[in-house]
């Protein structure tokens, strides 16, 4: 009896270690492909520029995979190269090939939120108050620079400049980081985060544009409270908006806010789901979802068994990021 029991335990340990190694490998591959030695994440699908989105994504991953060395490298590079000491936020884009790598002095609120969220998680995980204080400071700066009252709603502008047009505001619903906002609310006890969650959930529910009934990458909230696809961008549910169901699932895997995405994707077999759809014309991409896009679809549709954080050989930064973020959203 003893030998079979020992073999059973040995097999269980092998399976556990194998699963742990596979999980770590996804992060190790990600670092080797997209992270420089000094902590800069390169967007390989966009001329190797860097942005706060990528820094924040990777900082979250580093916390999840308990990689404090990588986290500190990422955070130190971000502070050194992207910090706006006036606003307390971060310049959104860094182009290493330019004489002035930071030309655009605007921020991207999703990047700021991701960085603050990663710092909050890091402070709690590694019991380091410096990370918590940095997160608190960024949260306050986001409230001061990017969160406003408009049309009776609490909304987060995509950047501090250029998105409030007085008669309407431009929103990017893929910046609605519900799970981060919830953690900020629990940390600070500020009502603004709860109100932002409630109003943004309502807005996503109202962004059922066209016959397909989906939100667009960019949307306009008018002063009268009505919403429409933003006219300065293609009216597509596309590469930005794919993060909406990801963040909704991360916030609440059972939320009914996922239903519009599920209903649309059920119209297509998994491997022939178009990469994007124009919500006004109903025209679709001539190519199909792959990589990280498909991972978000699988997560949303409840097809969880085949999910993997191991990127394909040709997957770029964004697709690989979505893959790993899906695993984080699952808590894996």
From Swiss-Prot:
Signal peptide: 1-23
UniProt entry keywords in alphabetical sequence: Carbohydrate metabolism, Cellulose degradation, Glycosidase, Hydrolase, Polysaccharide degradation, Signal
Active-site residue list: 53, 110
MF term (GO), any: cellulase activity
E.C. code: 3.2.1.4
Catalytic reaction equation(s): Endohydrolysis of (1->4)-beta-D-glucosidic linkages in cellulose, lichenin and cereal beta-D-glucans
Single GO biological process annotation from the record: cellulose catabolic process
Hydrolase as UniProt keyword: yes
Superkingdom per UniProt: Bacteria
SUPFAM superfamilies: Six-hairpin glycosidases (SSF48208)
Role played: Represents only 3% of the global cellulase activity.
Family named by the database record: Belongs to the glycosyl hydrolase 8 (cellulase D) family.
Protein name, as recorded: Minor endoglucanase Y
Taxonomic source organism: Dickeya dadantii (strain 3937) (Erwinia chrysanthemi (strain 3937))
Gene name linked to the record: celY
């Amino acid at each position: 009896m003893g030998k079979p029991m020992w073999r059973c335990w040995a097999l269980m340990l092998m399976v556990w270690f194998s699963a742990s190694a596979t999980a770590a490998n996804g992060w190790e591959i990600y670092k080797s492909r997209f992270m420089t030695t000094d902590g800069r994440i390169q967007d390989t699908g966009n001329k190797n520029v860097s942005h706060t989105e990528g820094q924040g994504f990777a900082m979250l991953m580093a916390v999840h995979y308990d990689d404090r060395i990588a986290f500190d490298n990422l955070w130190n590079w971000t502070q050194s190269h992207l910090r706006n000491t006036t606003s307390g936020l971060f310049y959104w884009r860094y182009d290493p090939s330019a004489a002035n790598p930071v030309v655009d002095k605007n921020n991207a609120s999703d990047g700021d939120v991701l960085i603050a969220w990663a710092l909050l998680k890091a402070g709690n995980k590694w019991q380091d108050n410096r990370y918590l204080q940095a997160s608190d400071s960024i949260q306050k700066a986001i409230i001061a620079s990017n969160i406003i009252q408009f049309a009776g709603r609490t909304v987060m502008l995509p950047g501090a400049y250029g998105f409030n047009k007085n008669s309407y505001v431009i929103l990017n619903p893929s910046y609605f980081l519900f799970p981060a906002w919830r953690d900020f609310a629990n940390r600070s006890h500020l009502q603004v985060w709860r109100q932002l969650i409630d109003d943004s959930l309502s807005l996503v529910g109202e962004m059922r544009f066209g016959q397909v009934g989906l939100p667009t990458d960019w949307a306009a909230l008018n002063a009268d409270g009505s919403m429409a696809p933003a006219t300065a961008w293609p009216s597509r549910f596309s590469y930005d908006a794919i993060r909406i169901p990801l963040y909704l699932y991360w916030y609440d895997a059972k939320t009914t806010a996922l239903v519009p995405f599920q209903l649309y994707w059920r119209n297509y077999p998994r491997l022939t789901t178009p990469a994007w759809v124009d919500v006004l014309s109903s025209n679709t991409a001539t190519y199909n979802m792959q990589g990280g896009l498909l991972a978000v679809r699988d997560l949303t549709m409840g097809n969880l068994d085949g999910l993997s954080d191991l990127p394909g050989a040709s997957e770029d930064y964004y697709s690989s990021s979505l893959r790993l973020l899906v695993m984080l959203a699952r808590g894996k």
